[in-house]
């Protein structure tokens, strides 16, 4: 099988973990990485050592300006490294990169991300929400993808990827009248280690390791983009908490059809073992956040944490590794 050739723009948290996933799953060939701020030797160090996910289970080195990744003694990826600020200048075609993962968090509109097409890329996947690019969430609306016209797409946010599969199952089975989502979210790179200035929301500048910080999120509203029948029915907020990784969604919803918690659990379990296997998970174990470190599933339903006030009003809980 010929593996799709992929380029990565931005070698931060998501870019590095995308490369780790590519090496582990062995379904795509990463042929190039661009990052204007990280030198080659530093890329080796940052990829090899990770405070959250641990040391890379393999070997990475440099050769003639390339990164060379080895797994089980075999070189699996030889990766050309660019250090360019303008994505239009990256010569993706020279290395055969047809697909680009846009993981800088900067080029998140169709216009900005389309710059990769000038260098020879054929498709661009933005690893963040986008104001105007078509948004696709696996298990929810990927069947709507049109390869003839969708050259730049968004894979939405980690939180939307957690919420949307769960919301789809509940809406399909019982109907959602309206709902409020809260994500209890681990710290991210945009936060401050100690109190500092922040231009938008002042409390976003408070020390991440010292505080629980209320924050805005568009993740719930974004579900309306991938599940049109829920458009305008969901909104939400976040609490940033001092943990390094793994977050959890709390969906409180009013249902059209009456449903017991057992019926809801059965519906989610059926989906998790059926058409959403590998995307939506289900557990009845007494789990905590670190139990999901490195879990590649988008959303893991915590049956034991869910509660119901009455058959029309429920609180549902689902975990996700917000980096992986």
Curated annotation (Swiss-Prot):
Q: Which CDD domains match?
A: GAPDH_I_C (cd18126), GAPDH_I_N (cd05214)
For the keyword Metal-binding, the answer is: no
Superkingdom: Eukaryota
Instruction: Give me the residues that bind D-glyceraldehyde 3-phosphate, please.
Output: 157-159, 188, 217-218, 240
Instruction: Give the keywords, sorted.
Output: Cytoplasm, Glycolysis, NAD, Oxidoreductase
The record's comment on protein family reads: Belongs to the glyceraldehyde-3-phosphate dehydrogenase family.
Does the keyword field hold NAD? Answer: yes
Quick one: a GO biological-process term for this protein? glycolytic process
Catalytic residue positions:
158 (nucleophile)
Q: What is this protein called?
A: Glyceraldehyde-3-phosphate dehydrogenase 1
Where in or outside the cell it occurs: the entry states: Cytoplasm
PANTHER family named among the record's database cross-references: GLYCERALDEHYDE 3-PHOSPHATE DEHYDROGENASE (PTHR10836), GLYCERALDEHYDE-3-PHOSPHATE DEHYDROGENASE-RELATED (PTHR10836:SF76)
Q: What is its main location?
A: cytoplasm
Which reactions fall under this protein's catalytic activity? D-glyceraldehyde 3-phosphate + phosphate + NAD(+) = (2R)-3-phospho-glyceroyl phosphate + NADH + H(+)
Q: What is its EC number?
A: 1.2.1.12
């Amino acid at each position: 099988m010929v593996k799709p050739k992929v380029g990565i723009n931005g070698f931060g948290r998501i870019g590095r973990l995308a490369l780790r996933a590519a090496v582990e799953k062995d379904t795509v060939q990463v042929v190039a990485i661009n990052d204007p701020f990280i030198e080659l030797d530093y890329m080796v160090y940052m990829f090899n050592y990770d405070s959250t996910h641990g040391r890379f289970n393999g070997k990475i080195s440099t050769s003639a300006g390339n990164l060379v990744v080895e797994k089980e003694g075999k070189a699996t990826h030889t990766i050309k490294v660019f250090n360019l600020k303008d994505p239009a200048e990256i010569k993706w075609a020279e290395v055969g990169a047809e697909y680009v993962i846009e993981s800088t968090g900067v080029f998140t509109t169709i216009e900005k991300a389309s710059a990769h097409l000038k260098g020879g890329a054929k498709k661009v996947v933005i690893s963040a929400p986008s104001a105007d690019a078509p948004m696709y969430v696996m298990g929810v609306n990927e069947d709507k993808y049109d390869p003839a016209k969708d050259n730049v797409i968004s894979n939405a946010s980690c939180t939307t990827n957690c919420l949307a599969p769960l919301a789809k199952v509940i809406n399909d089975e019982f109907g959602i009248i309206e709902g409020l989502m809260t994500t209890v979210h681990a710290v991210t790179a945009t936060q401050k280690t100690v109190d500092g200035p922040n231009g938008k929301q002042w409390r976003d500048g408070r020390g991440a390791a010292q505080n629980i910080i209320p924050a805005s999120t568009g993740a719930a509203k974004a579900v309306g983009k991938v599940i049109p029948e829920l458009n305008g029915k969901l909104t939400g907020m976040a609490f940033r908490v001092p943990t390094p990784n793994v977050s959890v969604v709390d969906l409180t919803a009013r249902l059209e059809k009456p449903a017991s918690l057992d019926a809801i659990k059965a519906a989610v379990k059926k989906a998790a073992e059926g058409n959403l296997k590998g995307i939506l998970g289900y557990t009845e174990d007494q789990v905590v956040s670190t139990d999901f470190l490195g879990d590649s599933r988008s959303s893991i339903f915590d049956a034991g944490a869910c509660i119901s006030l009455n058959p029309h009003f429920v609180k549902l809980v689902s975990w996700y590794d917000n980096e992986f």
